[in-house]
A protein has these predicted regions:
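Generic long, charged, amphipathic alpha-helical segments
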Residues: 127-144
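Membrane-proximal interfacial segments on either side of biological membranes
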Residues: 1-132, 158, 163-178
Length: 178
C-alpha cells in the first residue's frame, strides 16, 4: 500500500495486512480540522473473520448491528463510511454515513432459547443444531438510522426474507417473510 501525510491529512491507499486471523484491506483519508474535531472516510474489507473478533475490533458495530453478537462463525465484512471524529478520534455516531455488506456461511445462532422457540414453532427437522446455512446482509447508516435491506436467511428447510429499519436508540421495525 501507499501512505501519504501532508497538510494535516493522512491518506492510506490499498493497505493490506493479516490480523485477527483474517486478511484485511483498507483505504482511508483522515483530516484533522482542529484539536477537537476531525474527519475520516474509509473503505475496509475483512475476509473470513470470526464474528466475535469483528465486534471486538469494531465496537461501534454492536451499536449499529446488535444482532451480530448472536452468531458464531466466519464472515466476510465490507464497509465504506465517512464520519466526523471527536478529540479522541472516536466516531461521532450521528454524523456517520456508511454502507455495510456482511456475508457468511454455516453460522451458528448462540441464543439457545430463541432457537428452541423458533424450532418448535416452525417444526424444524433438526431441533438441536442452530446452524444458518447462509446469510448475506446489506446495511446503510444515515441520519441516525440503520436500514437493513431485505436479505434471505436459510435455516433447516426454511428460507426467510428479513428487512427493516433500526434506530440508534435501539427502536426498530423489521419485517420477516417465510
Amino acid at each position: 500500500g501507499k501512505v501519504q501525510i501532508k497538510d494535516q491529512m493522512i491518506n492510506l491507499e490499498n493497505l493490506s495486512m493479516k490480523a485477527l486471523d483474517a486478511m484485511m484491506r483498507t483505504s482511508l483519508l483522515y483530516k484533522g480540522d482542529s484539536s477537537i474535531d476531525g474527519y475520516a472516510g474509509f473503505n475496509f474489507d475483512i475476509y473470513k473473520i470470526n464474528i466475535g473478533k469483528l465486534v471486538t475490533f469494531i465496537p461501534e458495530l454492536d451499536t449499529i448491528v446488535p444482532m451480530l453478537r448472536s452468531f458464531k462463525g466466519l464472515v466476510n465484512f465490507n464497509i465504506a463510511a465517512e464520519s466526523r471524529l471527536d478529540s479522541l478520534m472516536n466516531i461521532r455516531i450521528p454524523s456517520l454515513r456508511a454502507a455495510v455488506h456482511i456475508k457468511g456461511d454455516s453460522l451458528v445462532l448462540l441464543d439457545g432459547d430463541t432457537f428452541r422457540r423458533l424450532a418448535k414453532i416452525l417444526m424444524f427437522k433438526n431441533k438441536k443444531e442452530n446452524m444458518f446455512d447462509s446469510i448475506s446482509v446489506n446495511i446503510t447508516v444515515d441520519n441516525g438510522a440503520v436500514k437493513v435491506y431485505p436479505f434471505v436467511v436459510e435455516i433447516d428447510r426454511y428460507r426467510a426474507a428479513v428487512g427493516g429499519t433500526q434506530n440508534l436508540d435501539m427502536s426498530f421495525n423489521y419485517h420477516v417473510s417465510i
